Amino acid sequence: MDGTLLVGRSSFPYFALVAFEVGGIFRLLFLVLASPLAGLLYYFISESAGIRVLIFATFAGMKVSDIESVARAVLPKFYSSDLHPETWHVFSSCGKRCVLTANPRIMVEGFLKEYLGADMVIGTEISMYKGRATGFVNKPGILVGDNKAMALKKAFCSTSTPDIGLGDRKTDFPFMNLCKESYIVRPDPGVKPMSQDKLPKPIVFHDGRLVQKPSPLMALMIILWIPVGFLLACLRIAAGALLPMPLVYYAFWALGVRVKVKGNPPPPAKKSTDQTGVLFICSHRTLLDPIFLSTSLGRPIPAVTYSVSRLSEIISPIKTVRLSRDRVTDANMIKKMLEEGDLVICPEGTTCREPFLLRFSALFAELTDELVPVAMSNKMSMFHGTTARGWKGMDPFYFFMNPSPTYEVTFLNKLPYDLTCKAGKSSHDVANYIQRTIAATLSYECTNFTRKDKYKALAGNDGTVTTKPGLAAKKVMGC
């Protein structure tokens, strides 16, 4: 797989992703410390022995369910960004597709079958005990050399042989000799990975904290940066929470957080004229969207949210009320807040990292005609500030742990009267129009995916949050 189906010839980055996402910084450190031994064994002693070291350093003691979760939610994004274009051209043209790999099957099978249409995946089988990986492998061991050829024979039951075999190293020759035609994929530094828009199934949702594929050097940099980055994140969060909102923009700038503001935001509502507040309709990138909207305006804007951690409630500088998911209750609550002033809502209901907009809930369009779309986008170089599988309380910390995160807030024109519900448009028409307007501004694609679709894909549930009784609505970090 590495070097054949993928451009990169090293599997270390994918082991590092599993190590960090499941075991955290200390497991990643253990893997980095073990990597010189793995490299020495791989290149000078035995390819199989080197892979065994990586498997042990990564998997020993991990819950198998956690490994499967990372393989489903995290790895596909990184695998898909490294596909070899020429290999994919051959692979996709075949009627039946089988992948033989020395990588653990548990890591690669989900991506290969769901996104590349593989019919069969044969990989190294890891050893398990009471739901945890032991760090060792089952017989016949690592699938390299003769083991790979034997696995292919067993899979095809000696009744037929593959028409085409692709490999990239000498240890692939034994299984390639069993194929009617065999081709070597030679290493070429000039080959660029295939564009992801050519995949048969686009990757709309993915999880995990790391933005870049962690090579050994990048993994070491991440380990060294995390203590420094955490202190920097605490300082940035404290500045946002403690300083008056008009000063937050300048404090962020001094601390390396860039906020770019475009468009002409409306002035605050005047209570003396009985003017109701403006409802800002934002695309949803992280739970910090309302914070950066408030930073751009220089005044705190209340927000409504579905779920947020208690830690985020404590450190938030803006006032927000939780949605109950009861249509009548939520509508009355939003109307009441609009009578008090401006309000921000993210009608997607959950975040999306890729250039897609999820389906907009239409409830907001029924409650007011004072609608201002806001296109939110951000850039992070090291860590993602969102998660579906992990603890959301760390989301703001991971975002602010980036060396120089950037948020771009684009205020669009207020929705014309003739496009509102008051002028006869349906709430769904209004919601869809605003979704298309924001998508066009960001060069994103509109979808009909929802919160349930995201959490089903990434976490295996529908994203429903159980409200704790007696928990008063206070401050939250965003939607």
UniProtKB/Swiss-Prot annotation:
Superkingdom of the source species: Eukaryota
One molecular function GO term is: glycerol-3-phosphate 2-O-acyltransferase activity
- Please state the pathway this protein functions in, per its UniProt record: Lipid metabolism; glycerolipid metabolism
Keyword list, A-Z: Acyltransferase, Glycoprotein, Membrane, Transferase, Transmembrane, Transmembrane helix
Which InterPro entries does the record cross-reference, listed alphabetically?
HAD_RAM2/GPAT1-8 (IPR056462), HAD_sf (IPR023214), Plipid/glycerol_acylTrfase (IPR002123)
Task: Give the way it sits in the membrane.
Answer: Multi-pass membrane protein
Induction data: Regulated by RAM1 during arbuscular mycorrhiza (AM) formation after inoculation with Rhizophagus irregularis.
Q: Which residues cross the membrane?
A: 14-34, 37-57, 215-235, 237-257
One GO BP = response to symbiotic fungus
Name of the top EC class for this enzyme: transferase
Query: Per the record, GO CC terms?
Result: membrane
Q: Which residues are glycosylated?
A: 448
Q: Where is this motif: HXXXXD motif?
A: 284-289
- Which EC number(s) are documented for this chain? 2.3.1.15
Q: Which reaction does it catalyse?
A: sn-glycerol 3-phosphate + an acyl-CoA = a 1-acyl-sn-glycero-3-phosphate + CoA
Entry similarity comment:
Belongs to the GPAT/DAPAT family.
User: Where would you find this protein in the cell?
Assistant: Membrane
Instruction: Write out the function statement from the record.
Output: Involved in the production of cutin monomers. Esterifies acyl-group from acyl-ACP to the sn-2 position of glycerol-3-phosphate, a step in cutin biosynthesis. Required for colonization of the root by mycorrhizal fungi, and appropriate hyphopodia and arbuscule formation. Cutin monomers act as plant signals that promote colonization by arbuscular mycorrhizal fungi. This signaling function has been recruited by pathogenic oomycetes to facilitate appressoria formation and their own invasion.
Task: Indicate where this protein is primarily found.
Answer: membrane
Q: What is this protein called?
A: Glycerol-3-phosphate acyltransferase RAM2
